[in-house]
Amino acid sequence: MAVKEGYDVLRLIEHGQTCYISSEYVRGRPLAWYIKEHPRIPKKLLLEWILHLERQLEMLHKCRNHPCYQYVNPYSIIVSEEGGLYFSDMEAGSNEEMLRLMRKKNIREHFLPPGMPYYRKASVSLDAYGLGKTVQYLLAMTEADPKLNWKETGRLRKMTSHCLNQFSKRQIQNISEIRKYIPIYQEKQPNIAGKSRAILAVAALLCVLAAACRVGKPHPGCRNEIGREGERQNLCRQ
């Protein structure tokens, strides 16, 4: 398949409790191809991507008539040249070639529930399934810099497990249910308190040493008196 430089994507506009859909053309590449070329991704960006995809689906579901995307996968997500993340407009004729790629058996089997055709009626749970599979793909194909810690990894596993459990009694009714599992990136703060304690300890030690030096040395006035007394004793002996 020839690599296109641009795609028609969905632009979601939120206005109060309602969202609106429009379509626009952006220059970029499908997420699946982008991460093959850039497998090492800043952890901050990786977590922001996952949160952004969840948020985009949430906004889509709030649009008029509550539409669903139907087939979420790394080929249906476009990374623009500016670094933005968008869902492809699958109804746009310009994306027909990409749609044919996504219909291939090896891709369908990985990003759709077992035995389910891509044309099945769209639903929130199906969107959640595709998102869970896409996040699994991201984690498998990329290396976060710095690496995800055990807590972040555990939360993302819970998220994907919840997304993929299609037959649970607690099937996802609202995509926002999974947001609580998505870690928020936090810069590691320097240990200012520890450094302050170390500085205070050194200062206290210097004060103690200075005091010890003063105790061990006679006062200059005392040295003068001792010197004069010695001179008087020498005169008397003479």
Features from the language model and the residues they span:
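Conserved short submotifs of the Hanks-type protein kinase catalytic core
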Residues: 15-30, 34
